[in-house]
């Protein structure tokens, strides 16, 4: 039976969709390694992307990596890898080493930032990145620049004031912002049905005068299509879009959480049957783009990258104690 080549309908060639899969795979393997390092006492904290790689990579591939700004939230390994960060960068951050590009070993893992690639630094209070994304979009519009800002957050963050204030301002001023809510069903331990009185996070868009769409967060092609359309709309001066990607958080909230206290093993096992690493891999095989040999080759190549990044970061120097106050204030 012939399988519909959906990627071709989106203007994506085989090389691009393989690159998407490779980036998803790298995200997963980095994340899995971080958990092993944490459990062996080598790094202090992990906050996971597992289960959300398809949404992150599909979205990031739909943006212009030469001029758009991304304001990722703490799970967005797939976004930052697509925009130019490396496995080595992320490992240096995990180990809090001097070369950590996010903060020189000062920030917690998951607080991504890399000025050269327009990855804007985030802070620990959730949703603070949303007003920043709106501000960058406002500046871009005032200066006549062709840029879009892309900001992500969890469905729990969509209940914070920063989201509503940012969305309202962007809607009123028709700013080129893409708000992407990565709905992974849980705000730490609070399930989605105890967070919303409406059916979908995207239903909130109408109150701010923007389109809202809910898509399958396990399908990178569906997410790509939605984000590409939102980016095109923003560049035409038609304003912001709210996109909700629905997936499932496959790990505990963080390395400090025990998810067995609020969800069942059967629920997690059911979600793993829809894991995008498996389902997108199956699509690539069904369309003849990837076979078992290529899949093994890609896995092997990714593991070499992860192993080299781990070894480098583990052996890299820590920041010097006398540098502790650097970068607290602006420096000449």
Go through the PLM ranges and name each one.
Residues 1-55, 61-62, 251, 257-260, ...:
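Conserved acidic/glycine
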Residues 3-7, 28, 64, 102-106, ...:
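N-proximal short alpha-helices
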Residues 7, 32, 40-42, 86, ...:
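Residue-level signal for pocket-adjacent positions within structured domains
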Residues 22, 66-68, 108, 177, ...:
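A generic secondary-structure signal marking the coil-to-beta-strand transition
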Residues 32, 36-173, 191-197, 202, ...:
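Cofactor-binding active-site loop characterized by glycine-rich and histidine/acidic residues
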Residues 74, 245-247, 328:
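A general secondary-structure junction signal
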Residues 118-315:
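Glycine-rich ThDP/TPP pyrophosphate-binding loop and its adjacent helix/strand module
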């Amino acid at each position: 039976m012939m399988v519909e080549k959906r990627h071709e309908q989106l203007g994506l060639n085989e090389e691009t969709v393989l690159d998407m899969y490779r980036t998803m795979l790298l995200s997963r393997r980095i994340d899995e390694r971080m958990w092993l390092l944490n459990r062996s006492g080598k790094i202090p904290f992990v906050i996971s992307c597992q289960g959300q790689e398809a949404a992150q990579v599909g979205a990031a591939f739909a943006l212009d990596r030469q001029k758009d700004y991304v304001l990722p939230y703490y799970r967005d390994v797939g976004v930052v890898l697509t925009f130019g960060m490396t496995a080595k960068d992320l490992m240096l951050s995990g180990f809090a080493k001097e070369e950590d590009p996010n903060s020189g070993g000062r920030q917690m893992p998951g607080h991504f930032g890399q000025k050269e690639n327009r990855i804007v630094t985030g802070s620990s209070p959730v949703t603070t990145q949303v007003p920043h994304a709106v501000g960058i979009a406002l500046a871009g519009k005032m200066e006549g620049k062709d840029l879009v800002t892309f900001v992500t957050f969890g469905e729990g963050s969509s209940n914070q004031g920063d989201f509503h204030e940012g969305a309202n301002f962007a809607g009123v001023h028709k700013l080129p912002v893409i708000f992407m809510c990565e709905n992974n069903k849980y705000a730490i331990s609070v399930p989605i049905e105890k967070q919303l009185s409406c059916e979908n996070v995207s239903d909130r868009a109408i109150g701010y005068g923007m389109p809202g769409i809910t898509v399958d967060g396990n399908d990178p092609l569906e997410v790509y299509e939605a984000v590409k359309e939102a980016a095109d709309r923003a560049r035409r001066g038609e304003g912001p879009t709210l996109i909700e990607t629905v997936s499932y958080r496959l790990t505990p909230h963080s390395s400090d959480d025990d998810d067995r206290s609020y969800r069942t093993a059967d629920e997690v096992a059911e979600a793993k049957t829809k894991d995008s690493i498996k389902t997108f891999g199956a699509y690539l095989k069904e369309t003849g783009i990837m076979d078992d040999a290529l899949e093994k080759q890609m896995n092997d190549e990714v593991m070499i990258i992860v192993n080299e990044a781990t070894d480098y970061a583990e052996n890299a120097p820590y920041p010097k104690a006398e540098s502790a106050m650097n970068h607290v204030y602006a420096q000449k």
